[in-house]
Amino acid sequence: MQKRAIYPGTFDPITNGHLDIVTRATQMFDHVILAIAASPGKKPMFTLEERVALAQKATAHLGNVEVVGFSDLMANFARDRQANILIRGLRAVADFEYEMQLAHMNRHLMPQLESVFLMPSKEWSFISSSLVKEVARHQGDVTHFLPDNVHQALMDKLK
């Protein structure tokens, strides 16, 4: 039986920290679904379609990654995709508290859904999409933190 995992997030935009997690996940699981949440409440800078396209290009070199948008409850999405592993990145203790709540709720909704927590490589442990956007808005150089296609798209958005 194939091990199918979901790595969900808003990915507004996808960063090299996210790519670090998804790349490592591809070595652990047969199929990884990079699930990009619509997240209208967060008022994303990029549309869902843009975020999916950016992530598809950024992960094109990874043969076992599928990038899809979703707006459903995570447990329902996982059930529909026949995945029982949820990948989550943890940068700090503050992330853990929130992620633990989500993991427990997801297990309540879908008992066979297991959460797997991965810490990003040290190089990416402090970055987030929000931080990268904020630095870029103030003309800071964020080239190192984003895939090339994403960096270009962010610069275009900020013009």
Swiss-Prot record:
HAMAP family recorded: PPAT_bact (MF_00151)
InterPro entries documented for this protein: Cyt_trans-like, PPAT, Rossmann-like_a/b/a_fold
CDD domains (alphabetical): PPAT
Record EC number: 2.7.7.3
Location within or outside the cell: Cytoplasm
NCBIfam families reported for this sequence: coaD_prev_kdtB, cyt_tran_rel
Species per Swiss-Prot/TrEMBL record: Salmonella agona (strain SL483)
Name used for this protein in its record: Phosphopantetheine adenylyltransferase
Primary location: cytoplasm
Family statement: Belongs to the bacterial CoaD family.
Catalytic activity, as annotated: (R)-4'-phosphopantetheine + ATP + H(+) = 3'-dephospho-CoA + diphosphate
